[in-house]
Amino acid sequence: MSISSDIVMLQETKLSEDEANKFVKYCYGWEGVATKEIGAFGGLCILWKPNKVKIQKAEGSIIIPKRGSEEFLSVIGHLERRTDLYKSISEDDLSVMDGGDRVFADISAMASTLAYENKLVIRKRVNQHWKMHFVEFFDFWDDHLQKKSTQAFVVCDKEIDAKLIVVAFRGTQLFEADDYITDLDFSWYDFPQIGKVHLGFLEALGLANRSIDKKSSHHLETQDINKPLAYFVLCQKLKNLLQIHKNAKFIVTSHSLGGALALLFLAMLFVNKEDKLLEKLLAIYTFGQPRVGDKEFGDFMNSKLKQSEPKYFRVVYSNDLIPRLPFDDGLFMYKHFGVCLYYNCCYCQKNLVEAPNRDLTLVYFIPIRITAIWELLQSLVLHYIKGESFKETKLSIISRIFGILVPGISAHSPVNYINAIRLGPPRLNPTLSNVKG
């Protein structure tokens, strides 16, 4: 039986007539197939229709982005795909310069998320999507790990006569073992001036080295050019930029581990009496930041941050695990300080002394899983209510499903922090008078 009239070639194919006949005969026992030998995409598929079979030859290649290219995204980049700021920074925003305004909170959250990407992705996002000016990407040396493991980038609102400078540290990368070594190393470093602080975070900034058991004495002019140290290089970079942009102020920000680095960077500006730099500080924003030091360190920072306008914005989302670490107990004695800008699972914000369940007690075992189920359901419908920009990626949805088993991990996603800033109050005011608990 010949069915050549019932077989249509939809695309060009490299199959010869004989090959096509053999294929169809082998699969279906049919003979007499008419084909043409013309070019192709590759990969053969059979399309069924009533009384008709269509043979389509599609040939192509799997495109794997090259690591370090503009197309190569980190895991975080696949979790959070939003590329645009909530609102472009206007001259009015820059003239008022209110650090608690949503405009600055949003750019801080977005920069903290973007910090997980490579230099080319960051530059493209900043220049093309944010319409800002990319200044530089840094890869800093860690003496303890004996490798470059601390990343940061700097941007300005514009290239000439900038009013805003943003410094963003990279947080903990999901598949980077060195980051977990830093996070889970609960060793102290005792500073006479400021109290005890997390040694691993200090080493990531190039401010300490346990192998020589003393504070780092590096200075910019004596550093190995191939082993740049974060604190010293960024401090000098800010001085240079503020010399060029005399009307500018700066924000330091990050998510996760990077939040701890941002906070310690600020602390060392106080220790080293960098008063001219500190006068230009607009705000420090941390998202899901772990504890950094002991009570003495907290008292030191509170005394330095006592100003009429709040500077320190510590944002915590729901059951995020990382802000509850290292533990605040008799053994570890790590403590947060200042006001916690806490967002619940519905993105409602309130000021607290500390986030609920501060030490991950088993009392919350069932409630946090109920919350995780709610967060999963909410993520599936939020974009219908609030707009397409809140539609989550498949990877983000999968992470929320996994989060029912380990809720604190999925709650740490930058997706939650960007949602919180955009759906929460238009202005944050972390003052003690607003604390509710």
Question: What positions do the PLM features span?
Answer:
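Short phosphate/oxyanion-binding micro-motifs
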Residues: 1-66
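Non-catalytic, mobile gating and regulatory segments of ester bond hydrolases
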Residues: 59-253, 257-437
